[in-house]
Amino acid sequence: MVKGNWALFEEDFWSINTILQTLIHTSSSKSVMLIDKTGQLISSIGEPPGFDVTSFASLAAADFAANQQLAEMVGETDFATLVHQGTNESLYLSLIANRVILVVLFDKKTSLGLVRLKARRAGEELLSVLNKLFDKLQYKDEELSAASLGAEFAAE
């Protein structure tokens, strides 16, 4: 299930940003973003891009959605990574936990192979952080639901 609203705890925010910062340094990338599948920007690290990040996040999510349809048409369940290579600028996108998209913007000063390797490692670390976050959010939602239910019964 894709949720459009994110509750990010401070410790998780810093864990995510530390992973993204490490990815930028180890891959010599320009910028890294974490976007949810609805197109909401979760975090952005690195050089500020010369474009509207909100629009970019929406387009990246739509790109992944379109490619998922293409994957199904050719008999795949999904394409977990996408690459867009340009003459000067390139994008590497990777789906993590089937809920968020890691986007790495890099130029010709670094190689796709290096970006792919470092992004894969960062993805594994992000998966661990995100799974813990999802567990917290589910637990939090259950607490809120139980509290609300109890309050409704107490009011009668």
Predicted segment positions?
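Acidic, low-complexity cytosolic segments
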Residues: 1-29, 38-156
